[in-house]
């Protein structure tokens, strides 16, 4: 059964309960944006890996083909994306 937005949010919220999470995409290709203070002392690659690791089985099986991760602290998110 293909993953949906709620599946992604639920899994990420299990690791980062205080995160602001948004998901775009469908079927087997998604982009997630995760904003949490937990990322404050983590490097960008560490942040992305912490989320991607949650979906290793789905990526390996092909159930999830593409997962793009944008992981920011609240301060980074507040600087504006423009």
Question: What are these regions, as identified by a protein language model?
Answer:
Residues 2-82:
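N-terminal, polar/charged subdomain of small-to-medium soluble alpha/beta proteins
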């Amino acid at each position: 059964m293909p993953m949906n937005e709620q599946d992604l949010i639920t899994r990420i919220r299990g690791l980062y309960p205080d995160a602001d999470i948004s998901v775009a995409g469908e079927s087997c290709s998604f982009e997630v944006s995760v904003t949490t203070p937990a990322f404050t002392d983590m490097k960008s690659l560490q942040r992305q890996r912490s989320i991607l690791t949650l979906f290793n089985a789905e990526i390996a099986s092909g159930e999830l083909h593409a997962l793009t991760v944008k992981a920011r602290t609240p301060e980074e998110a507040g600087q504006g994306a423009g």
